[in-house]
């Protein structure tokens, strides 16, 4: 039997799936090799741009007095876009994804910014939102 708190444990995979479903095809028109992942490492050949989406310490914010039911979770995800092409590619992909998170009622902080290490451009932002047990995404 699934826990009545399963919704809280599934937020990471749900948010990842929704964002990927909404943005992957539209981004593939401009970036045909784009790869979405939740894994920091892979044995396969690198594809660029790569979009790494990871949760950052989801936090229980409200529960019943007996601590049996989670009512509210503060969820933060970090999005990291890497490319070996141009700075603007990393930034554009990150900005499109940030807007998708905004459309899903997330707060963005910091806004997407870019850094370079070697030949790789990296754009990063974080998106945060509070989820209640009966919220729909």
Residues covered by each model-derived region:
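Small/polar-rich, solvent-exposed N-terminal microdomains that initiate assembly or binding
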Residues: 1-64, 87-92
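Residues embedded in well-ordered secondary-structure elements
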Residues: 42, 66-68, 116
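Acidic-leaning, charged glycine-interspersed low-complexity segments
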Residues: 92-137
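Oligomerization/assembly interface segments of phage tail-like spikes and tubes
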Residues: 68-85, 121-133
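Beta-strand-rich interaction surfaces with strong enrichment in secreted/lumenal proteins
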Residues: 4, 66, 111-114
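Short, low-complexity, polar/charged sequence segments that are solvent-exposed and flexible
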Residues: 55-58, 70-76, 97-100
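Short, positively charged, low-complexity/disordered linker segments
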Residues: 80-97
């Amino acid at each position: 039997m699934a826990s009545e708190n399963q919704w809280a444990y599934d937020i990471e995979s749900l948010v990842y799936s929704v964002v990927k479903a909404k943005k992957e095809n539209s981004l593939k028109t401009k970036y045909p090799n784009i790869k979405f992942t939740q894994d920091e490492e892979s044995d396969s050949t690198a594809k660029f741009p790569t979009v790494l989406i990871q949760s950052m310490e989801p936090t229980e914010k409200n529960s019943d007095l007996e601590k049996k039911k989670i009512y509210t979770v503060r969820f933060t995800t970090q999005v990291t876009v890497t490319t070996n092409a141009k700075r603007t590619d990393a930034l554009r992909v990150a900005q499109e994804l940030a807007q998708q998170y905004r459309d899903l009622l997330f707060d963005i902080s910091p806004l997407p910014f870019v850094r370079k290490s070697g030949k790789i451009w990296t754009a990063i932002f974080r998106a945060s939102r509070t989820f209640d047990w009966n919220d729909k995404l």
